[in-house]
């Protein structure tokens, strides 16, 4: 039995990975005159941000906490996330809030799910301010 998780940045890539696993498993099975049973169980869908929503979130965050405190991640994150169900139905963006204190570099600080993480609870103030500003801006409608 081989088990694992497939994480991808698009459904197309996920399908290609599944096809590749199937081909390799069937090839190895045939080479050894063995039987293979392949089962895939869908987990969370791929999490894909709406570009306009991501721009909106970044703009609002920059206004609230300053452009130096915001960053657009250069590469997609392949987390398994239940928020992906929301993004499959409603345009939106997954926004990360750093819990790193101002005394540490976020680029080298331990990630949030690490056993070495050191949260600065003052970061929650920024999170509440940013999310509140996004909600208020969204509810006020597009600029005229």
Go through the PLM ranges and name each one.
Residues 1-144:
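Metal-dependent amide/peptide-bond hydrolase catalytic core
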């Amino acid at each position: 039995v081989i088990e694992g998780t497939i994480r991808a940045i698009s459904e197309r890539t996920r399908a290609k990975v599944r096809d590749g696993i199937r081909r390799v498993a069937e090839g190895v099975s045939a080479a050894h005159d063995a039987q293979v049973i392949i089962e895939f169980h869908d987990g969370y869908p791929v999490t894909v941000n709406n570009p306009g929503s991501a721009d909106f979130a970044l703009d609002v965050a920059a206004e609230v906490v300053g452009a130096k405190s915001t960053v657009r991640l250069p590469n997609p994150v392949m987390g398994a996330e239940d928020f992906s169900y929301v993004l499959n139905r409603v345009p939106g963006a997954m926004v990360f809030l750093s819990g790193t204190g101002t005394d540490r570099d976020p680029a080298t600080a331990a990630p949030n799910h690490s056993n070495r993480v050191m949260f600065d609870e003052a970061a929650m103030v920024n999170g509440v301010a940013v999310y509140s500003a996004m909600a208020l801006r969204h509810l006020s409608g597009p600029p005229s």
